[in-house]
Amino acid sequence: LAAQGAQGVDLEALAEHRGSLFGGLSGPQPAQKMFESRLAGALAGLDPARPVYLEAESNKIGDILIPGSLWKAMLGAPRIAVTAPLADRARHLIDTYAELTGDPAALSMIIDALRPYHAADQIADWQAQAKAREFSALAQGLMRDHYDPRYARSTARKAAVAAIVPLNDLSEGILRSAAAQILSIKGV
């Protein structure tokens, strides 16, 4: 979107966290006040007459809280849902979290942190996939059985979806086309 001239704020970059149990591997997050200072700077540079694009599934990014006034505005703002095939999303996650494929102990700890939410046999299956380096099956299972259902419950409490942009895959050409499609949506 930014490459096509859209305004956006990358909340995950400001929070130095990717926003899930797997998201905090690059080091410590900034203090809440530092995040808010960065956010204020990013918002000050925006044109209020133009749409602003944000991504957030939750009011919390790691240990950082999105300020209440911004979160409230986000909850009431028009939403665009972008969908993609599970296998393509899995490949993207494997690339994004490549550091985990080389750190079995860290990956195991993160999977163990899901124990309060899933049956022991599900955790054992994910642990076995991680140990066998079956990262595509692991990523697909985590999305299908953990993240997607949580995301669906979370989004059900927010404003209605203004548009759905389905992607056939996550190739550069498809992403550019999707960005153009998003920017052409009226009322957003």
Where are these regions (language model features)?
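Conserved nucleotide-sensing/catalytic segment adjacent to the nucleotide-binding pocket
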Residues: 4-73
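Hydrophobic positions on the alpha1 helix immediately C-terminal to the Walker A/P-loop
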Residues: 1
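Conserved NTP phosphate-binding and transfer environment spanning the P-loop NTPase/kinase superfamily
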Residues: 72-79, 83-188
